Amino acid sequence: MADALAKEADFFSIGTNDLTQYTLAVDRQNPKLDTFFDAHHPAVLKMIKMVVDNAHRAGIWAGICGELGADTSLTQKFLEMGVDELSVSPGRILPIRKIIRDTDVSEL
């Protein structure tokens, strides 16, 4: 689906909270299911990579918004995936910026 949408869009902004919820079929509003809501799940990360690849093939950029964008444990992974932009709250900019500056993208 991302390949078809990329032909019509100027960019993709991946909402990771909703993506996680729908990919894993877990209602994030239900506290009984909290243990199943895993934004680091391989299926979620694979979906992000697939969207980024389709965006780039169509010549558009793909960014991350939602909680995962500010997750420093995934910043290098997102760089490796080719994510073009991370949308983060002001308090998370400096830690994310440091990781990006300290990462040699050519080694990923």
Residue ranges and their predicted role:
Residues 1-108:
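Conserved alpha/beta-domain cores
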